Amino acid sequence: MPTLKLFVYAIVIFFVSPFVFGFLSNDPGRNPGRKD
């Protein structure tokens, strides 16, 4: 099932991209978990 594989890839990218962008920016102030 190619569609299922594509769906899984989308989920993985969706969860991994925030960590990748956070690592590339290397800015703890932009962490959405610490708005206060």
UniProtKB/Swiss-Prot annotation:
Pfam families: PsbI. Keywords: Membrane, Photosynthesis, Photosystem II, Plastid, Reaction center, Transmembrane, Transmembrane helix. GO terms for cellular component: photosystem II reaction center; plastid membrane; thylakoid membrane. The chain crosses the membrane at residues 4-24. InterPro entries: PSII_PsbI (IPR003686), PSII_PsbI_sf (IPR037271). It is found in: Plastid membrane. The keyword NAD does not apply. The keyword Cell wall biogenesis/degradation does not apply. PANTHER family: PHOTOSYSTEM II REACTION CENTER PROTEIN I. Belongs to the PsbI family. One of the components of the core complex of photosystem II (PSII), required for its stability and/or assembly. PSII is a light-driven water:plastoquinone oxidoreductase that uses light energy to abstract electrons from H(2)O, generating O(2) and a proton gradient subsequently used for ATP formation. It consists of a core antenna complex that captures photons, and an electron transfer chain that converts photonic excitation into a charge separation. This is Photosystem II reaction center protein I. The gene is psbI.
